[in-house]
Amino acid sequence: MNEIPINEKAALPLGEKYALTIKEAAIYFNIGNKKLRRLAENNLGRFALESGNRFLIIRPKFEQFLSQSTSI
């Protein structure tokens, strides 16, 4: 049988993920980790979520934020 182990994660391309970690977002948007973390801390609820000590960037909302910003 071709069963997939339960503990093995299905890897999605970054462009298909709804929420990205700071590290993934830094790679996807070509923005530094520190800058993204600062943006996430200052924009909780707008395009960022906090899960414990981890920030998640909501990709579609962050894309919209970037398209409306002249500088970050």
Describe each region flagged by the PLM.
Residues 22, 40, 55-59, 70-71:
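Short, structured secondary-structure boundary patches
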Residues 7-35:
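Polyanion-binding surface elements
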Residues 5-8, 43:
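Hydrophobic alpha-helical segments with strong N-terminal bias
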Residues 27-56, 63-64:
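Major-groove DNA-recognition helix of helix-turn-helix-type DNA-binding domains
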Residues 4-5, 62-72:
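A short, Lys/Arg-enriched interface patch at domain edges and termini
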